[in-house]
Amino acid sequence: LALVERGRMMGLAVAAAPRAPVGHGARFFTRSHESQREAERPSRPLRLLDLSTLWAGPLATALLALACVEVLKVESPSRPDGAGEGPAPFFDLMNGTKRGRCLDLRAADGRRDFEALLDSADIVVESARPRALSQLGYDAGSWLEERPGRLWVSITGYGRDHEWIAFGDDAAAAAGLAWSPAPADEAPCFCGDALADPITGLHAAALVLLHARVGQGGLLDLAMAPLTARVAAAEHDGLTTALEPGPASQGWQLVDEERRVPVAAPRARVVRAKAPALVAEGSVETTGGQLRPC
C-alpha cells in the first residue's frame, strides 16, 4: 500500500489489487445540475459532442451512434486521441460511425467553432479531469444551466472531484479482478484487457439513452473503478444470476437451470468504416472521407 500511495502522490494510475471484489454497494455515478427538457424532443437526431479518448468514452459514443445519435468527435491537434496510435482496426471500430473535427481551443477560431458546437449539442461526453476544460474557460455546470434537459457525461477513474486517476487495467485490478477463484498462493494477473473500460462504456451508453428518453438532463459523473467493483462484487457475491451459454440444435441459448433463453450466436464486431482523420480546422470529415463545412 505504501508503494501505491507513493505512486498516487506522483500522479500515476496505480492501485492495490484486493483478492475479493470490494464494490458491494459502491456508488458508481452521481447526478447533479438536474433539469427536465422543457419542450418536445426535436425531430432531428440527438447531437453528441464526443471529447473523450481511448476506450470507455469512445465505446459509449460508438454505441450511441449505432442508436442513431449524431456523433461528432473533436480532437486537439496537439493532443489527439492516443488510441489513434494503436491498432487501426480498434480505432476504426470505436470511431468509424462518427464525424470528426480538429480544433485548437487555444486559438480564437478554434474556440469560436467549439462554442458553436457546444451550443448545438444535446449531449457532451468527455473523459478528462475537470481542470482540463476549466483552464480553457469551459465549465459543465454553466453549460447545463443554460440548456435544460441536456446531458454532460464525465468519465473518470474515481470521480470528477477525486484526486486519483485510473485507466482500464488498474481500475479493474482495484475492483478485485486481478485474482481468479484459485489457491491463495496464485499470483494476480489481468483478467482481460482493461476491463473497466468496456464495462464503463456500456453503462455510460445505457445511462445516456435512459436519460434522453425521459428528457432528464444534468451532469452524469461516472467513475470507472467503483463501477467495475460493483459489477465484480455482484458476480462474486451471487447477486446476479449466472447464465451459462451453450450451443443448441436450433441456435445458441443461455441456460439457467430449467430456463433456456434463445440468443444470437456470439460474433466479433466488424469494422464498417474508417475513423475520421484529423483534418484542417473549419472542416468536418465524414466516415467516407469527404470533407464538408461544419
PLM regions: where:
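Acyl-CoA thioester-binding alpha/beta core of soluble enzymes
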Residues: 1-82, 111, 115, 120-123, ...
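Residue-level detector of functionally special positions within alpha-helical transmembrane segments
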Residues: 46, 98, 168, 176-177, ...
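Short glycine-/small-residue-rich Rossmann-like dinucleotide-binding loops
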Residues: 53, 105, 128-130, 156-157, ...
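Short beta-alpha connecting loops at secondary-structure transitions
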Residues: 98, 190-193
